[in-house]
């Protein structure tokens, strides 16, 4: 079968494998690329190519991640796989690899294990919207009742963390046998690919979401008014549209009277573009870096939220010592630092470098935020942690 050229017209979906160590995540990743390449064209990736994950940096944190790509007839997938548990924690919290859906790998020989639970919880906290289960190593279990029991346990665990356990697709397979070319088990990989296509909806593109621009700079242009600059995070801003200025101070309304890029006037600015937006009736001192421009009514300012955070280890350039309750670092959202206080979970006295922990944060100024927003934790400009807003509280 001839290799087809990369079709940009196909919807692009980001997925990844999660689950307990040695349950077969990397073997499954290799099996998916191999079976889909054989069936639909594309490149197969061997286990050792994937397992030898390169180091990358995301927000100053070292993460080992493998990226593979594969196609089904209707979609193009980018898939991440991490070698170690710590890499998953970092990856999910920093959003280095945002997932539109995840494949939870559970070995039928073991059933759910501690990291199975932790990855499901992390998925819930960081906003992984869909999980599909691949029950691996089913070739090693002869007992149908045992398989049903494991399946039931996995469904209960998913439901416990607010995923729809009863309706989650579960595929019974053997990644190793599929990788070895056994047709019976290859069919299970195609079944899994079918669920990726049908169960994970097409992700909404940034440009189709409501307009938001984090303000990086503010200028006053004599005779024209106040211009804010920044990169449009999502949506489109057109000349003549109303906007809200959200965060830090009271929310204000204004109208966009001009959009410019590279000193050229445009009639709109789109997601991903660096633009200047001219605002009607706003004085230079009424607006500042760290606020956002947004479509009215689409985002609110908040000071209190529950978060999932990863604290950098000493080797990553993080703290050398633990911190305790009463810790007051800066929280860096989009373009600015805001000081905040923390509440640790019950029974947790201190947090060590290299830990991941759930904490409630209260900021001294409100920031425009939604669940899923990423942030860095800093001390005097140095990054000591990374986090994600799990739930806005007030």
Curated annotation (Swiss-Prot):
Annotated region (G1), positions in chain: 19-26
Location within or outside the cell: Cytoplasm
tr-type G domain mapped to chain residues: 10-204
G5: annotated segments: 174-176
Region of interest: G3: 81-84
GO CC annotations on file: cytosol
Binding site for GTP: 19-26, 81-85, 136-139
Top-level EC class as recorded in UniProt: hydrolase
Region (G4): 136-139
Lineage top rank: taxon: Bacteria
InterPro entries noted in UniProt: EF-Tu_GTP-bd, EF-Tu_GTPase, EFTu-like_2, EFTU_2, G_TR_CS, P-loop_NTPase, Small_GTP-bd, T_Tr_GTP-bd_dom
Gene Ontology molecular function: GTP binding; GTPase activity; guanosine tetraphosphate binding; translation elongation factor activity
Known EC number: 3.6.5.3
Positions contributing to Mg(2+) binding: 26
Region (G2): 60-64
Assigned keywords, A-Z: Cytoplasm, Elongation factor, GTP-binding, Hydrolase, Magnesium, Metal-binding, Nucleotide-binding, Protein biosynthesis
Main location, first listed in the record: cytoplasm
Family, as annotated: Belongs to the TRAFAC class translation factor GTPase superfamily. Classic translation factor GTPase family. EF-Tu/EF-1A subfamily.
Subunit: Monomer.
Protein name (record): Elongation factor Tu 1
Species this protein is from: Shigella flexneri serotype 5b (strain 8401)
